[in-house]
Each structure stands twice: as structure tokens, then as C-alpha cells.
Amino acid sequence: MSTQMSVFLSQEAAQPQWGARAILSFSEAGATIHIGEGHDLGAVQRAGRTLDGQGIALVALSGKGWDLESVWAFYQGYRGPKKKNALEWDALAEADQVELEARIRATDWTRDIINKTAEEVAPRQLATMAAEYIKSVAPAGTVKAKIVKDKDLLTEGWEGIYAVGRGSERTSAMLQLDFNPTGDENAPVFACLVGKGITFDSGGYSIKPGQFMTAMKADMGGAATITGGLGLAIERGLNKRIKLILCCAENMISGRALKLGDIITYKNGKTVEIMNTDAEGRLVLADGLMFASAQNPELIIDCATLTGAAKNALGNDYHALLSFDDELSHQALTAANQEKEGLWPLPLADFHRGMLPSNFADLSNISSGDYTPGASTAAAFLSYFVDDYKKGWIHMDCAGTYRKSSSDKWAAGATGMGVRTLARLLIDQAK
């Protein structure tokens, strides 16, 4: 007897015995998702989550109505971190099937690497895994990758990454990846993508309480998300030269670790006083943004699980978008809307740049005072390391990267949210 369950779509309401608001009902034929006349993709994703939660490990999407977006919605909800469910669907139109498979590859890689333990993904391993993934989806010969590690970081002047990671026994690393499909080694760099890759964040000497540390294997979620976004863009046909810079370190406590009151002198001459070692993401991103600016690209995007303030403001359902470039922000929000992902703007203004005073350095790594806008001042800090911060730069504070517990739509763990938005934004901007 087959243990596979067929799942159908219906615009009709469920029979009364299933409840007035039921989105799922069962019969001898299998399960039916009741999507209403509006083709509710949220209902499809919630049904996928419910079936996974019931331990149904073999599903066939059957009958009429299954298109690219509905199959994708079901897959998102049905996928969990602890086991590999088997999902079948009738072949879609060729272009839709290609797109679906590319989405699955990109978001599976993103979700899987975020869900791995910090023991499995050290800073150098993160850089290596990201480079291997991009090489696996890019045309042969279009990718070159360099990993700068340990004291070589100091040789190249990447003081922030080295300082944050020096308390760990696991060496820090910067991935410098060059995707160049043009065939011209002198082609201009169209965009630089910068990701925060903190593979575990204890908070350092500004140590996190235990309940806030349990999800800190996912503090490299920005690096994973922006890598997945590039991978999907490549599979969608991206034809411009892109550089990916991942800033990878482990924020730990030891006799060598960064201390409060230490001052970092960056490659651009800026000095930063460390007033909180748990505000470390911005310290590593500063190096990546300086590298990016030196490539003179048209576009710089950075992604980071940077602040609790963004998560407090938006919850798990949106990433925060901060930028001085209103037109680019609008285009990013449009891309997110088209890809059905959550992205929401938070304010970033010149006065935020003045909220990082230090008595001993050019800047403090945190803002002072009561009720300071933490997400905005974190982005303002980053702006000091972008040459033309008013144009062509956006910062994504990835509040929706990871869920500590499951919801009605998502399993616990990584979501992959943002990968599609980044891919579309790159493709659209490259036109």
C-alpha cells in the first residue's frame, strides 16, 4: 500500500465538518487545500507546513491549478530542517520548471548552510562553501575566488575582520569572489555584494544572555542570503560582472579577544572605539564595504543579521531596507513585491551619522543615549566606509532570516527569504 499522499487544490470551501475556516480537508483521494477564489498562496504554504508537521513524508501535488507559485509556496512550507520530505509535481511549462529548480537550489543551499551548526561552519569553511556553491551554478570559467585568512587579513589591511575574530581559535577569513561572465578580464565591476559572516556570535565580552545566544549559529545569515541571491541571479541569466565579499569571523571570548575601549584603525583611516563587543557585525562589514568601494561599482548591496532593533520593529516576516538612495530603495521594494517577499524601509538620514560619538576615536561602534534608533545608527556607521554612500548603496538588515521556533508557514530555522529579491534586483539593475 502506497504511503504517498495526493494533494489537490480547490477554490471551494471545505465541508462544514472541517470547520468554517478550514484550509485543509481529507478524503480517500488525499488532502485538499481550500485556496478560495483569490488563489491564496499563504494557505498553500500553511497547508504544506501542516502536512509536514503531521509527519507526511511523501506528497504528490495532483490535479489542476498547480502552477509555479503554488508549487513553490507548498514547497516552502513543506520543507523542514530535520528530514528530507519527498515532493512530486506534474511537469510545469519549461521556463517555469527551470525557474522552480533554480529557486530550490538557491534557497536550499541558503537554508541548509544557515541551519548547520557553528562546529560545522567555521569562518573559512563558510567562505569555501560559498565559493563552491557559486562555482557549481555559474558557467565554467566565469568564477575566480580568493580567501584571505588569519594574519594575511592584516597584511591586506582588513583590521575589522581580524579584530572581531582574534578571540577565536578558528581563523577569520574574507572571501573575494569575482563572477565575470563577459570574457573580458578588464570589464568594469557592475555590482559588489557584501555579506556578514559571523559563524557564531557569543557577544564577546559584552556577552549575550543564554536565551539570545541559542540562534547565533545563524549570525552568518546575511552572508548566506546574499550568496544565494547571487546564485539565483546567475541561474536567471545575469550577464554583468559581480564581486561577492564575505566577511567571516567567530565572535568569542579569550585572552586575545577584542575588549571594550579598544580602538580599531581601518584602512581608510577611520578610527573606531569599541563600546560594545556585541556590535561586531558592522566592524567586519566595514572592511567588506571598503573593498567594494575600491572596485568602483555602480551598485553596492550589503546583507547582515545586524541589529535586534530591526527584528523588534519588523518581526520575522520582513527584512529591513536602509539607504540614502530613494530611487534605488523604491526599486528594491518593487523587486521584493514582485517576488512576494517581505522587505520594509526603515529611516536613514544624515543626522543618524552624528549619533556615534567617541571621546577617543572618530566613531564609536554603538550609539549612546536612550531610545536611539539602533537599526538606523548601525547603517549610519556603515556609511562611513562607503565612498559614495548617498548613491547606489543599500543595506539590508536581515530580520527574517531565521526563526527560533516554527510558525504556521515556516519550520523552525532558516527561511531563505530575500534570495529571490536580491536576484531580481541584480537582474533588473543590470539591464
From Swiss-Prot:
Residues that hold Mn(2+) 1 according to the record: D201, D278, E280
GO molecular function: manganese ion binding; metalloaminopeptidase activity
Cofactor binding description: Binds 2 manganese ions per subunit.
PROSITE patterns reported in the protein's UniProt record: CYTOSOL_AP
Known cofactor(s): Mn(2+)
Keywords, alphabetical: Aminopeptidase, Cytoplasm, Hydrolase, Manganese, Metal-binding, Protease
Keyword Manganese listed: yes
Subcellular location as annotated: Cytoplasm
UniProt-listed Enzyme Commission number(s): 3.4.11.23
Catalytic activity, as annotated: Release of an N-terminal amino acid, Xaa, from a peptide or arylamide. Xaa is preferably Glu or Asp but may be other amino acids, including Leu, Met, His, Cys and Gln
A cellular-component GO term for this protein: cytoplasm
Xref: InterPro entries: Leucine_aapep/pepB, M17_PepB-like_N, Pept_M17_PepB, Peptidase_M17_C
Family of the protein in this entry: Belongs to the peptidase M17 family.
Summary of the function given for this chain in its UniProt record: Probably plays an important role in intracellular peptide degradation.
Protein name, UniProt field: Peptidase B
